[in-house]
From Swiss-Prot:
Name this protein carries in UniProt: Protein SEC13 homolog
GO BP annotations listed: cellular response to heat; chitin-based larval cuticle pattern formation; COPII-coated vesicle budding; ecdysone-mediated polytene chromosome puffing; larval chitin-based cuticle development; mRNA transport; positive regulation of TOR signaling; positive regulation of transcription by RNA polymerase II
Encoding gene, per UniProt annotation: Sec13
Species whose genome carries this gene: Drosophila melanogaster
Keyword match Transport: yes
A matching Pfam family: WD40
Length: 356
């Protein structure tokens, strides 16, 4: 059964765009159009432990680093900046690093799996993706940029898990597929792209085409050792699509999870990767689980039972429709579109904190 555990009054002075729990589910970070980030204890009183001020515009998203690096939090904003914060206690926070080399709003940030070190990916409306790597011994940051990652802008970014599928399940799993760093991004060109690090450069490995409008969110599912990878994508076109690959990530197939009543803004996997939470313009949060036949079913909030969603397994979509939608957005897109309007971006989900 799904039920409300707690309600927190953040006391932000404007729209709250995103909330994220830390690795242990104890500290909650929120961000808002008031330009601030606030830290709460998720299991105690509702008063903010700290208020982080450093942005001069709406803050779209926050992301926690793995606790092996300490209490580290990243935030991104319409002001084109990414700020990495560090705390000695939940109440005492300082600015560890500030990155300001994007030409437009920074819409999404995501820390890499801890096996790769302290690495942060950033997605921007200027069409590029930045990968920031910290040398933790010297406290020096290095930035690499993927220019022109998406036409018009990049809305979302997510890392591939470092843990590879178990070779015991599939002999096609190789050490190469396990060791290579990968990212998935979604953009205003209606595309989903998978990027691979190759000789200190980031190259486009796959281009996934199925959405007919802006891709608002992407989420690479946590690995539990099974011989496949899954990526969920959410779009303005009201669809959530789950992409699945074979063990060596050489081929991807798409399945439409559901067609919603309004645009879909945010998606989040459970820590075990078997439940997907979805929220969007219909002001609802729904939970979905894949059955043994590969069909996605919605979990009933009242009883905890599953309800099958009658959807086509694949979404028909032509290249000409994609081009038409892209041209329409090119004509309408502002110079700094940001991730979305306030009303759209108010329903983002906390990352990977769902119960399974």
């Amino acid at each position: 059964m799904v039920s409300l555990l707690q309600e927190i009054d953040t006391e932000h002075e404007d729209m709250v765009h995103h909330a994220a729990l830390d690795f242990y589910g104890l500290l909650l970070a929120t961000c808002s159009s008031d330009g601030s980030v606030r830290i709460f204890h998720s299991r105690k009183n509702n008063k903010a432990l700290a208020e982080l001020k450093g942005h001069q515009g709406p803050v779209w998203q926050v992301a926690w680093a793995h606790p092996k690096f300490g209490n580290i939090l990243a935030s991104c904003s319409y002001d084109r900046k990414v700020i990495v914060w560090k705390s000695t206690t939940p109440r005492d926070w300082t600015k560890l690093y500030e990155y300001s080399n994007h030409d437009s709003s920074v819409n999404s940030v995501d820390f890499a799996p801890s096996e790769y070190g302290l690495v942060l990916a950033c997605a921007s409306s200027d069409g590029s993706v930045s990968v920031l790597t910290c040398n933790t011994e010297y406290g020096v940051w290095d930035a690499k940029k993927i220019p022109n990652a998406h036409t018009i802008g990049v809305n979302a970014i997510s890392w591939c898990p470092a843990q590879a599928p178990d070779p015991a399940f599939d002999q096609r799993v190789t050490s190469r597929s396990a060791a290579v760093k990968r990212l998935v991004s979604g953009g205003c060109d209606n595309l989903v792209k998978i990027w691979r690090e190759d000789n200190d450069r980031w190259v486009e490995e796959h281009r996934l085409e199925a959405h007919s409008d802006w891709v608002r969110d992407v989420a690479w599912a946590p690995s539990i050792g099974l011989p496949r990878s899954q990526i969920a994508t959410a779009s303005q076109d009201r669809h959530v699509i789950v992409w699945s690959s074979n063990a060596d990530l050489s081929e991807w197939t798409s399945t439409v999870l559901h067609t919603f009543d309004d645009a879909v803004w945010s998606i989040s996997w459970s820590t075990t990767g078997n439940i997907l939470a979805v929220t969007g313009g219909d002001n609802n949060v729904t939970l979905w689980k894949e059955n043994t036949e590969g069909q996605w079913i919605r979990i009933n909030y009242e009883s905890g039972t599953a309800i099958q969603s009658k959807q086509p397994s694949h979404l028909p979509h032509s290249h000409s429709q994609q081009q038409q939608a892209l041209q329409q957005h090119q004509q309408q897109a502002p110079s700094h579109p940001g991730p979305s309007s306030d009303s759209e971006h108010s329903s983002n989900l906390s990352n990977s904190q769902l119960s399974n």
